[in-house]
C-alpha cells in the first residue's frame, strides 16, 4: 500500500516538472486545497515579471539585451534607426545614400530573359554580382552615334535538320536594316541567289524583353534542302545587315538653308520662338510672314465686292499666287472666311492676307493686290454712278431689261430673211400711183380700189408668179399693206396704230375676195388649164 503511494507521488513530481508554469500553478492550488492550506494568489505585476524571466531563460535574449551586451555574440538583424538630425544637407545625403544602395541591390538581383528560337524555351541568367563595375554610359549627344551591326553568331540559332530539310532562324529585331530585310523585293533577291525559302516572322519590339512565346521578336526563317544553300543565304543576309544604307531620315529637312537675304539685318525675323526656339535637330523653325492689304470698301447691296476681288472661281487671287509663290486669302467682315480659332469671320475690315516665307515675294504680291484693289474701286465708282440700275447691277455688270419693240422687230427681220427660196420677190408699185384694177379670175369683175386711196401694194402678175411650188396660204408673197401682213411676212414697221388695216381694200370682205383671187391666179399659173375650184 505504501509502495503504490510512493510510486504515484513520484510520477506526479515528474509530470509536474514537464508541465508549464500555468499548469504548475493550477496543480499547486489543487494540492494546497487537498492539504487545507491555500497559498495566497500572486499579483499581475509579479506574474508579468516572472513571464519575462521565463522567456529570457528558455529562448533568445530580450530585444533590448541584443544591443546592450556586445559579448552575447548576436548580430543585429536590422540596422539601428538613425536619430533625426537637424542638418538638412546631412539628411539629404543619407537619403541619397540609401537610394543608391537599394538600386545597387535591385540590379544585383535582377535577371534577364532571352528567347531561344531553335529550342523554343525561356532561359534565365542572373546578372553580374554587385561588385561588378557598372555598365558604361551611353555616348553623349555631342558626337555622332555609330550603329555597330551585330555579329551573325549572336543572332543566328542552331540548325535544325530533319527529313533532308535544314532550317535556321536569324533574329533581326535589333538590326538597323531590318526594314529593308523584311521587304518582299529583298527576300526575293536572296532567294534567287541562294535557292532557299525565306519567311519573315515575329513582330518588332523596341524592348525585346516584352516578347512572348506567342509573339517572338522579329526574325527571318530560312528553309533549305542542303547546307550549301543555307550558308549562301546566311552570307547574303549578313551582307544586307552590314550594308550602309545612309541616314534613315532625310536630314535635308533639318538643315538650315543658306540664304543671304534671310541673314540681312533689315529683313524681319522669320524664325519662331516655339519652346526653346529650336525645331527638330536643333535647327530654328521657320515662320510664315504675313502682310495685310485692306480694300477700304464696304460691301453694298447689289455690288458683289468679294466676287469682284477674287474673280470668277478665284482666278484673280490664283494668278497672284502663281506669279509670286505666295498664299493670298480674303479675310475680314463680309469675306465669308471662317477663322478656325473663333469659328466665325474676323472682326477686322475686309482685306487680303498675304503669307510667305520670303519677304520679297510678299512685297511683289502686295503690289499686285494693290493694283487689283484699284481696279475694283473704279468698278465700284462706275456702278455707283448709275443710280437707276443700281439695285439690278451685279458687280460691274448691269442687267438691262429686254426691249419688246426691238425684240419683235428683230424677230420680224430674221423671219423675213428666211422666206421660201422658191418665191421670187414681186416689184412694188409706187405708193403715189393708184392701184390698177385687174381681173384676177376669169368671169369675175375686177376689184377696184376706192378713189383717192393709195397704197404700196405689190400687185402680182402672171409673169411674176412662181413656176414651182406652192406659197403659203396665209398671204401672197411680196404683198404688204399697213397692218395686213402676217407675222414674218411683209415689210416691218409699216403698221399705223389707230387705222383700219383693211381700209385700203374697202373693208375686210373685199380683202378676203381679193385674197381668194390671188390664190386662184397662182394656182392657175402653176397648173395651166385647171378648172375653177369648187
UniProtKB/Swiss-Prot annotation:
GO biological process, one term: mRNA cis splicing, via spliceosome
Gene Ontology CC: one annotated term: nucleus
Residue spans of biased composition, Low complexity class: 263-272
Protein name per its UniProtKB record: Uncharacterized protein C30D11.14c
Compositional bias segments (type: Pro residues): 130-141
GO function term, MF aspect, one: RNA binding
Domain of life where this protein originates: Eukaryota
Feature: compositional bias, Polar residues: 102-113, 393-408
Entries under InterPro entries matching the protein: KH_1_KHDC4/BBP-like, KH_dom, KH_dom_type_1_sf, KHDC4_KH-I_first, KHDC4_KH-I_second, PRP5/DDX46/KHDC4_KH, RIK/BLOM7
UniProt-annotated stretches for the region Disordered: 1-150, 252-284, 383-434
Amino acid at each position: 500500500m505504501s509502495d503504490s503511494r510512493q510510486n504515484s507521488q513520484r510520477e506526479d513530481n515528474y509530470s509536474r516538472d514537464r508541465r508549464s508554469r500555468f499548469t504548475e500553478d493550477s496543480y499547486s492550488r489543487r494540492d494546497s486545497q487537498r492539504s487545507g492550506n491555500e497559498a495566497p494568489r500572486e499579483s499581475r505585476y509579479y506574474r508579468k515579471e516572472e513571464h519575462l524571466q521565463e522567456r529570457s531563460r528558455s529562448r533568445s535574449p530580450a530585444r533590448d539585451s541584443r544591443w546592450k551586451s556586445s559579448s552575447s555574440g548576436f548580430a543585429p538583424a536590422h540596422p539601428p534607426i538613425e536619430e533625426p538630425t537637424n542638418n538638412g544637407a546631412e539628411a539629404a545625403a543619407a537619403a541619397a545614400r540609401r537610394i543608391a544602395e537599394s538600386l545597387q541591390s535591385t540590379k544585383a538581383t535582377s535577371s534577364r530573359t532571352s528567347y531561344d528560337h531553335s529550342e523554343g524555351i525561356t532561359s534565365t541568367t542572373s546578372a553580374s554580382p554587385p561588385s561588378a563595375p557598372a555598365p558604361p554610359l551611353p555616348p553623349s549627344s555631342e558626337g555622332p552615334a555609330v550603329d555597330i551591326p551585330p555579329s551573325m553568331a549572336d543572332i543566328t540559332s542552331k540548325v535544325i535538320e530533319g527529313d533532308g530539310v535544314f532550317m535556321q532562324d536569324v533574329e533581326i529585331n535589333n538590326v538597323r536594316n531590318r526594314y529593308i530585310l523584311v521587304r518582299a523585293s529583298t527576300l526575293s533577291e536572296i532567294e534567287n541567289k541562294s535557292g532557299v525559302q525565306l519567311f519573315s516572322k515575329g513582330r518588332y519590339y523596341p524592348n525585346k524583353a516584352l516578347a512572348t512565346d506567342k509573339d517572338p521578336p522579329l526574325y527571318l526563317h530560312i528553309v533549305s534542302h542542303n547546307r550549301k544553300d543555307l550558308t549562301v543565304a546566311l552570307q547574303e543576309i549578313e551582307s544586307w545587315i552590314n550594308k550602309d544604307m545612309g541616314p534613315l531620315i532625310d536630314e535635308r529637312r533639318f538643315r538650315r538653308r543658306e540664304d543671304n537675304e534671310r541673314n540681312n539685318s533689315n529683313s524681319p525675323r522669320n524664325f519662331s520662338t516655339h519652346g526653346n526656339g529650336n525645331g527638330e535637330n536643333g535647327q530654328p523653325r521657320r515662320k510664315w510672314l504675313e502682310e495685310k492689304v485692306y480694300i477700304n470698301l464696304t460691301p453694298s447691296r447689289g455690288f458683289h465686292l468679294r466676287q469682284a476681288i477674287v474673280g470668277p472661281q478665284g482666278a484673280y487671287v490664283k494668278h497672284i499666287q502663281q506669279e509670286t509663290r505666295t498664299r493670298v486669302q480674303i479675310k475680314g467682315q463680309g469675306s465669308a472666311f471662317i477663322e478656325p480659332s473663333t469659328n466665325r469671320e474676323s472682326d477686322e475690315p475686309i482685306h487680303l492676307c498675304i503669307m510667305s516665307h520670303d519677304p520679297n515675294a510678299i512685297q511683289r504680291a502686295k503690289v499686285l493686290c494693290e493694283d487689283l484693289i484699284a481696279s475694283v474701286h473704279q468698278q465700284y465708282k462706275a456702278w455707283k454712278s448709275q443710280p437707276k440700275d443700281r439695285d439690278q447691277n451685279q458687280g460691274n455688270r448691269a442687267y438691262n431689261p429686254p426691249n419688246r419693240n426691238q425684240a419683235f422687230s428683230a424677230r420680224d427681220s430674221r423671219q423675213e430673211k428666211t422666206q421660201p427660196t422658191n418665191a421670187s420677190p414681186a416689184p412694188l408699185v409706187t405708193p403715189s400711183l393708184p392701184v390698177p384694177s385687174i381681173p384676177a379670175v376669169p368671169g369675175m369683175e375686177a376689184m377696184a380700189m376706192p378713189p383717192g386711196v393709195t397704197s404700196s401694194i405689190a400687185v402680182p402678175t402672171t409673169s411674176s408668179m412662181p413656176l414651182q411650188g406652192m406659197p403659203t396660204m396665209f398671204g401672197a408673197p411680196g404683198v404688204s399693206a399697213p397692218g395686213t401682213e402676217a407675222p414674218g411676212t411683209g415689210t416691218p414697221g409699216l403698221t399705223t396704230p389707230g387705222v383700219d388695216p383693211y381700209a385700203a381694200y374697202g373693208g375686210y370682205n373685199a380683202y378676203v375676195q381679193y385674197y381668194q383671187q390671188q390664190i386662184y391666179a397662182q394656182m392657175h399659173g402653176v397648173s395651166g388649164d385647171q378648172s375653177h375650184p369648187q
